[in-house]
Amino acid sequence: MMQAHDVLTLTEPPLDLDLIDLDEDFDDEDIELELEETSDSNDGKKTRRLASARRRDAARKKPYTEDSIRIYLQEIGRIRLLRAEEEIELARKIADLLKLERIREDFCLYSDAEWGKQVFLFERIEKIIVEKSEKEPKLSDIKAYLGKTELTAPLLEEWLAKSKEYLSAFKRRLYHGRRAKEKMVQSNLRLVVSIAKKYMNRGLSFQDLIQEGSLGLIRAAEKFDHEKGYKFSTYATWWIRQAITRAIADQSRTIRLPVHLYETISRIKKTTKILSQEMRRKPTEEEIATKMEMTIEKLRFIAKSAQLPISLETPIGKEEDSRLGDFIEADGETPEDEVSKNLLREDLENVLDTLSPRERDVLRLRYGLDDGRMKTLEEIGQIFNVTRERIRQIEAKALRKLRHPNRNSILKEYIR
């Protein structure tokens, strides 16, 4: 398939004034004549005006090589539009091209290795036939068979010549089909530009819109059926619009939205605009949802999805010394919180080490310091094979020790 780059570079296209707006050019004689008729007698002022006029004239006459869009519009403007009978003829050749390319793909389907595998299988089949028949064909038998089939050397040469003739005709039809497809596409590139202009300022540059629209035009040329009686431009318009709108949906946003959601957002905007004109005020969410036959919850979800992302580095305030990210609460732990938690764990271990081993183990199990699960007095008693009351006494004694200023002074810093 011809790529969009080929569409933009292979064309050799009179300038279509409907597609671009060029300022009217003036030559030096017009400028000088205008200046002579000026009643200003100040020579210095006249000299400055003359120099300014010449600079403007030079700017107007800059080569278009600095503006690729204008060059492209000039080139495609030189391509003549097709007549109805020409469209039909080109469409027939393109349909023939598609059939030939399918045939060509079928013949080129196997690689050399795969063809070798096919030959190997044929030889295996031949060997099995020989084994089953329990005898090998003799040379005399082969000669007799060839004599019956009348495969003479002149006949084989005639077949070879015919195959070369057919291959040459096949290549010619492929070439003419591809040229017909090129001509059909190039003759309708102005249609792509006219449609692309309607989708400007939607997230893609004008060049990208033309590129995507050209791909849609190529697809239209391949799918066009002239027997249905439609003009090609009418048929191609849908394909061009579809290619452009899908590209906008896929590429224009930082966070990609599904195409169907993008289309719904476009319908919401259009409905809002229509209701605003009818009511002469901004419509409410309920009015928009009722008009579009959807729930308010779905409307709000789609509207929220349509919001554009904003950078966390966006300056805030008159002095612009703060950033948006400074005012957003983080869901996870900050580095400071993580460091503080690690220090608390270390200090808590040091304090627990001042207790007896049994007191330390009871507090660990009671408050879930190891696995995060707090155990009951009865569960801990079963672990140590003592009564529930004995565990309560051990816990109370350990807590009294921890309340001593020599032990809890370090831990109090974390709760201030």
Swiss-Prot record:
Gene Ontology biological process terms from the UniProt entry: DNA-templated transcription initiation
Coiled coil: none
Signal peptide: none
Alphabetized UniProt keyword annotations: Cytoplasm, DNA-binding, Sigma factor, Transcription, Transcription regulation
UniProt KW Calcium keyword: no
InterPro entries: RNA_pol_sigma-70_dom, RNA_pol_sigma70, RNA_pol_sigma70_r1_2, RNA_pol_sigma70_r2, RNA_pol_sigma70_r3, RNA_pol_sigma70_r4, RNA_pol_sigma_r2, RNA_pol_sigma_r3/r4-like
Motif residue range(s): Interaction with polymerase core subunit RpoC: 208-211
Stretches the record annotates as Sigma-70 factor domain-2: 184-254
Localisation: Cytoplasm
Sequence intervals crossing the membrane: none
Region described as Sigma-70 factor domain-4: spans on this chain: 351-404
Main location: cytoplasm
Disulfide bridges in this chain: none
Region Sigma-70 factor domain-3: start-end pairs: 263-338
Domain of life of the source: Bacteria
GO terms, molecular function: DNA binding; sigma factor activity
DNA-binding region, residue intervals: 377-396
CC annotations in GO: cytoplasm
PANTHER family assigned: RNA POLYMERASE SIGMA FACTOR RPO, RNA POLYMERASE SIGMA FACTOR SIGA
Subunit structure as annotated in this protein's UniProt entry: Interacts transiently with the RNA polymerase catalytic core.
Role according to the record: Sigma factors are initiation factors that promote the attachment of RNA polymerase to specific initiation sites and are then released. This sigma factor is the primary sigma factor during exponential growth.
Family: Belongs to the sigma-70 factor family. RpoD/SigA subfamily.
UniProt-listed HAMAP family: Sigma70_RpoD_SigA
Protein name: RNA polymerase sigma factor SigA
Taxonomic lineage: Bacteria, Bacillati, Cyanobacteriota, Cyanophyceae, Oscillatoriophycideae
GN (gene name): sigA
